[in-house]
Amino acid sequence: MLIYPKIYLENATKISEKIIKENNIKGIILDVDNTLLYYNREMLENVDIWCNNLKEKGIKFCIVSNSNKKDKIKMIAEKLKIPYISFGMKPLKFGLKKAQRILKLDS
């Protein structure tokens, strides 16, 4: 079984409180490459502020990356103070289901 995103936006920080409320979102699973990091490997501008603001509103976060570079994923997760899963094997469900359990979210 494959799992696909339900919402597509320009970048992660475009997920607004309005979108979260309209879609009853309780948690956000993020990728690293081209989601939290730009193509040039710099962190997406203001992603830490965006993440902290939503965490204050009760939104849970987890990084699920297909990368096997655990140190890179861990560094980003620690900066954002969120859990992470490296080598998540997306679009297969294993890493995403693990993130769902970590965040204690229903399917």
Q: What is the meaning of each model-derived region?
A:
Residues 3-10, 67-107:
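Substrate-recognition "cap/lid" segment bordering the active-site pocket of phosphatases
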Residues 28-30, 35-42, 47-74, 89:
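Substrate-recognition element of Asp-dependent hydrolases with the DxDx(T/V) motif
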Residues 15, 46, 95-98:
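Well-ordered alpha-helical segments embedded in enzymatic catalytic cores
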Residues 1-30:
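Non-catalytic pre-domain segments flanking phosphatase-related domains
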Residues 19, 53, 98-102:
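A generic secondary-structure signal
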